[in-house]
Curated annotation (Swiss-Prot):
Gene: prfA
Record-linked NCBIfam families: prfA (TIGR00019), PRK00591.1 (NF001859)
Record organism: Thermotoga maritima (strain ATCC 43589 / DSM 3109 / JCM 10099 / NBRC 100826 / MSB8)
Region spans: Disordered: 262-282
GO MF annotation: an example: translation release factor activity, codon specific
PANTHER family, per database record: LD18447P
Subcellular location: Cytoplasm
PTM section of the record: Methylated by PrmC. Methylation increases the termination efficiency of RF1.
SUPFAM superfamilies named in the record: Release factor
Family membership noted in the UniProt record: Belongs to the prokaryotic/mitochondrial release factor family.
Function, as annotated: Peptide chain release factor 1 directs the termination of translation in response to the peptide chain termination codons UAG and UAA.
GO cellular component: cytoplasm
Keywords: Cytoplasm, Methylation, Protein biosynthesis
The name this protein goes by in its record: Peptide chain release factor 1
Length: 342
């Protein structure tokens, strides 16, 4: 970080910089100073927490400063990440496990709903399809709030549950999965969709159990012909609203597709967000008999399963952010590029 700062100081001292370059490097310098400030506050808070533990302070006092530390990490992520968008689109689908996987998908949807409430974010359901037993075959929802995508992107992947299903009479523990995909919502101006590339179909919206809930064809299905991406929406009252919602989702999926294609061209080090839903690709396990949640990306374990499912996700996400920052600081920063020699 100090080397980056010195590099920009040298760049700012060059007499041949244009006003635009001067402005850009000035902004980068200010950003580094703010990052340094928050990094120092994180270090001080960590040291203070250790001191409280050594002195045997009560857990409530320690917990207060741990929550403050979680918030500092999220502020640091907001500064570091170029993808710290305030708008996210979240998609949840059952993986392996049949009806139990659909019930687990419902639990995850409830968890994110509660988390959004805790963060003061706005959550809007775009599309939801339920099973006869109350599980979810698919749910797509928008989340809007400070750094919503920058935080929720850590939830992308395969989530695994180990528990006795309500449908299991023998009391045996089953393993099921659900996939979560988190995409940044993309503005219309940021990605071009040509009308001639779209096939738009309308149909009657259906409710629980497949029964039709209205007599007009208000539901909309959009197919992007060049890529084969299909988006349908029937939650809104009018055909126009459903079409606009479907286009919002389509823009995000096209952006993600373009991003993944670009990343594959540059590097093979990243994989797709959610994989196939196979158990071996899990990012997190929720073990009910042991009251345990384990995030396999960082070997993090908590025995607060119910609290986490009730939306208390800040601690686990902050650990992921901390790991991300420590391992990818230079890549995440992406600043301090040198000026071309003339």
């Amino acid at each position: 970080m100090k080397e980056k700062k010195k590099e920009i100081e040298k760049l700012l001292a060059r007499p041949d910089l244009t006003p635009e370059q001067m402005k850009n490097y000035g902004m980068e310098y200010a950003k580094i100073e703010e990052i340094e400030n928050i990094t120092n506050r994180i270090k001080e808070t960590q040291e203070f927490i250790e001191l409280l533990r050594e002195e045997g302070e009560n857990e409530l006092e320690i917990e207060k400063y741990e929550k403050e530390l979680d918030q500092l990490y999220q502020e640091l992520l907001f500064l570091l990440s170029p993808e710290a968008s305030d708008k996210a689109i979240v998609e949840i689908r059952p993986g392996t496990g049949g009806e139990e996987a659909a019930l687990f998908a419902r639990d995850l949807f409830r968890m994110y709903t509660r988390y959004a409430e805790r963060k003061g974010w706005n959550l809007e359901v775009a599309e939801i399809h339920e099973t006869d037993l109350g599980g979810i075959r698919e749910v797509v929802f928008f989340v809007k709030g400070k750094n919503a995508y920058g935080i929720l992107k850590y939830e992308s992947g395969v989530h695994r549950v180990q528990r006795v299903p309500v449908t299991e009479s023998g009391g045996r523990i089953h393993t099921s999965t659900a996939t979560v995909a988190v995409l940044p919502e993309i503005e219309e101006k940021d990605i071009e969709i040509r009308p001639e590339d779209l096939k738009i179909e309308t149909f009657r919206a259906s409710g629980h159990g497949g029964q039709y809930v209205n007599k007009t064809e208000s539901a909309v299905r959009i197919t992007h012909l060049p890529t084969g991406i299909v988006v349908s929406c029937q939650n809104e009252r009018s055909q126009y609203q459903n079409k606009q919602t479907a286009l919002r989702i389509l823009r995000a999926r096209l952006y993600q597709l373009q991003k993944e294609q670009k990343e594959r061209e540059i590097s093979q080090k990243r994989k797709s967000q959610i994989g196939t839903g196979e158990r071996s690709e899990k990012i997190r396990t929720y073990n009910f008999p042991q009251n345990r949640v384990t995030d396999h990306r960082i070997n993090y374990t908590s025995y607060r399963l119910q609290e986490i499912l009730d939306g208390d996700l800040d601690e686990i996400i902050s650990k992921l952010i901390e790991h991300d920052i420590e391992n990818n600081l230079e890549e995440v920063l992406g600043i301090g590029a040198s000026v071309e020699e003339k």
